[in-house]
Amino acid sequence: TARLTYAIKTTSQSGTFDGDETITQATTGAVGKVVEWDSSNSIIYYTQERFGNYGTSSTTGGKVAFSGANVITGATTSATGTPVAAADTAVTLAGGNTLTFSDGYANPEMAADSGDIIYIENRKPISRSSDQIEDIKVIVEF
């Protein structure tokens, strides 16, 4: 299984990062949202988008990448972690994939906005009542 999230390998962390928690790096002004905290490997999986409080700097309004050995702090849990300063570190994940970190940071394993839509089915709208419950199933294959 490949991920479309950025990753930070941390050392000397305190606390546990929660999913959907905003993380910041004060020195750089980087902002992101935690997707998953892998406590066994000390890896923060996160995303950044070009929306306020989700990936853009409140000062510049631009997307700022996490970088350097600056402390990363969780907004709600106050958990902290310092990125590993090693040049290249490879971590083998539970599924067998290997994630290579450069100075504590790893890019997504898949490229965003790449790929092809192989099937679209257009249907007419169906009227629903406001108290009706629906099950939605989505199949995604890579």
Regions found by a protein language model. Name each.
Residues 1-142:
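Interface-prone segments of viral and bacterial extracellular assemblies
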